[in-house]
């Protein structure tokens, strides 16, 4: 004799599955975002900077710093694909959304010109026109600028310094605040420290 289907039991089972995903996923995501944030704080401290504020959530961290060379103040926002909601996580994977680190900074001596370098294989290429008019291709980067003449020597210096890094999506210098924009992958803490070290030397 076949038992009749019980819709209420099915709803309970689905609810239990989603709740389990939420609990396990939230814990794993919190640990991941805390690990990334702590590694950034440690890297900044080792380079001579200081953390002024830090907030950690399930899928994001917001950090504020000061005193990293000529970078008077800067903030770092890290966002990851949370595992707490299985549907959202699957959708983010299908859409090829990547974990992202965004840095915005105030430089004591603002840049004399504005330009942006976007890695040709990065997700940031989809929005390249937001950063100005296409100017040139330099190695693996596309140069965009809202000005007619980008500082060629400094641009080449930046490209040369960033060449070893494969986590960088975009770096932008501006005469207006924020003077510095950086988009990068937060996946490898040691490379984030290298990126911060390079930026400290460049500015």
Which sequence ranges carry the predicted segments?
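Residue-identity detector for threonine
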Residues: 27, 51-52, 116, 133, ...
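N-terminal topogenic membrane-targeting module
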Residues: 24-97
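Single-pass alpha-helical transmembrane signal-anchor segments
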Residues: 7-24
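Generic secondary-structure transition motif, activating predominantly at the C-termini of alpha-helices
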Residues: 41-48, 159-166, 200-203
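Short amphipathic C-terminal alpha-helix that caps PH/PH-like domains
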Residues: 191-203
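Residue-level detector of alpha-helix boundaries and kinks
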Residues: 21-25, 184-187
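Structured extramembrane domains adjacent to transmembrane segments
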Residues: 72-191
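Short, strongly hydrophobic alpha-helical membrane anchors
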Residues: 1-4
